[in-house]
Curated annotation (Swiss-Prot):
Residues 302-315 have a biased composition (Low complexity). It is a multi-pass membrane protein. GO terms for cellular component: plasma membrane. It is found in: Cell inner membrane. Belongs to the UPF0761 family. Keywords: Cell inner membrane, Cell membrane, Membrane, Transmembrane, Transmembrane helix. This is UPF0761 membrane protein Sama_3404. It comes from the Bacteria. The chain crosses the membrane at residues 5-25, 45-65, 102-122, 137-157, 179-199, 207-227, 251-271. The keyword Cell membrane applies. Residues 285-323 are annotated as: Disordered. It comes from Shewanella amazonensis (strain ATCC BAA-1098 / SB2B). PANTHER family: INNER MEMBRANE PROTEIN YHJD, UPF0761 MEMBRANE PROTEIN YIHY.
Length: 323
């Protein structure tokens, strides 16, 4: 009896997973994440240099980050742009240096373009969550400005704290089983999970359950890490871009990787947004089915009520009836 129950539970679990996958595929088609990822790729490439310039300007305002600026840049480029991080870092640093020499109007334009990227992310994720109410202009602007100012500080602080903890002699001496190297290796994955979780919890203009956002963040982070390894392997194993584009091979590589990255980000968002829809529908269906099982047979089946006239007219005739 116990084995039968266990088998039925396993079957129902996998059936539920399969139904959710079908619902997810339908949701992906409706949301057109490939089109949204293309739009975000265009905006990202347009605002990449302004965003980096604003980020570095914010970090430069804090003396504590001066000594680890190179460490932060290396960590970001190595973990965000596989196989071409050094080249992209060289070009972007040169562009940022040129942009920092501009006038106040030019710097203001950089800030506006950087805000365009945050606004595009906000609109795409709220469209995936089917958010009907838009944020007020001042609320949205305050949120975008907070991301521009506090985002780099939090990122720099987290990397600085991690570097400090890793360099502690106490940890290195107490690390008998090699836990510290393992944690260092998993740091990019943990940062990705935290970043996606914050994105899925904060950006949609509605309440998102923590577990739903965490599941989407975990899937997106795992896909992001797998995508980095796979993309780096493809670029290094099949260097067709370098044979075609030569020294400009970094440009299409960056285009493709940014597009894949946004596809993964939006895919995780669709998972987090579709999960409560599916669970609500599934619970409703289960309740209806349970209600039909608990109800008496006469109430469970819908049949038209008999009226007295029709019942009397259909009575069988007896011998005493006339005619």
């Amino acid at each position: 009896m116990k084995n039968k129950i266990d088998v039925s539970l396993i079957q129902s679990f996998f059936l539920g997973v399969w139904r959710f996958v079908l619902h997810l595929v339908s949701r992906l088609k409706e949301d057109q994440i490939n089109v949204r990822a293309g739009h975000l790729t265009y905006v990202t490439l347009l605002s990449l240099v302004p965003m980096v310039a604003v980020t570095m300007s914010v970090l430069s305002a804090f003396p504590v980050f001066q000594g680890i600026r190179g460490t932060i840049e290396t960590f970001v480029y190595e973990n965000m742009i596989p196989a071409a991080g050094d080249t992209v870092q060289t070009y972007i640093n040169e562009f940022v240096k040129n942009a920092s020499k501009g006038t106040a109007v030019g710097i203001g334009f950089l800030v506006v373009v950087a805000i365009m990227l945050i606004s595009a992310i906000d609109k795409s994720l709220n469209a995936i969550w089917r958010t009907k109410e838009k944020r007020r202009f001042m609320v949205a602007f305050s949120m975008y400005w907070m991301v521009l100012t506090l985002g780099p500080v939090l990122m720099g602080a987290s990397i600085a704290v991690t570097s400090y903890l890793v360099s502690l002699k106490v940890l290195s001496e107490a690390d008998v089983y090699g836990v510290v190297p393992m944690l260092i290796e998993k740091l990019p994955l943990m940062f990705s999970v935290a970043a996606f979780l914050l994105l899925y919890m904060a950006v949609p203009n509605q309440k998102v359950k923590f577990l739903h956002a965490l599941l989407g963040a975990l899937v997106a982070a795992l896909l992001f890490e797998a995508g980095k390894r796979g993309f780096a392997l493809y670029v290094t194993t099949f260097p067709s871009y370098e044979a075609i584009y030569g020294t400009l091979a970094t440009i299409p590589i960056l285009f493709v990787w940014v597009y894949l990255s946004w596809t993964i980000v939006l895919f995780g968002g669709v998972i987090a947004a579709a999960l409560p829809e599916y669970l609500d529908y599934d619970d409703g269906g289960d309740e209806d089915a349970q209600g039909c099982q608990d109800a008496p047979s006469g109430e469970a089946l819908s049949s038209p009520k008999e009226n007295p006239s029709s019942s009397s007219s259909t009575k069988p005739k007896t011998d005493n009836d006339p005619g």
